[in-house]
Amino acid sequence: MRTDDAPFHAHVYFTTDSRASAAALRERLLATVAPDALLFVGELREHKVGPHPVPQFECHFYESYLPRLMPALESCGLTVLVHPLTLDDTADHTTLGRWLGGAPIELDLSVLDPPGVNQGFARFGRTDF
């Protein structure tokens, strides 16, 4: 992992009705994967995964890519959580996170790693849940 640029996640949430929009956004993002910016675009997950109680897919990217990624996320019409990847998993998903689109999703914070531990680092840029 690079040490000069902070790692970030974006979680794109969808419903049965908005699944096609999520799939289209995912395909657009897959076309832009690059080792210096957008590293990973996960599969559409149709069930609860980690703290995410509704269907979603996630992207891994470096902070420097955020200005290029935000227009796509802001205009997709879906609820999106963008957050840094730090050693405080709870803060990442709450106070450090930024919600776009619809109303924030109530996350299951009980499953997050304790402060000082974040298993997300090991899978950053490689795999989703």
Model-derived regions: residue spans:
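Long, contiguous binding/interaction regions
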Residues: 1-129
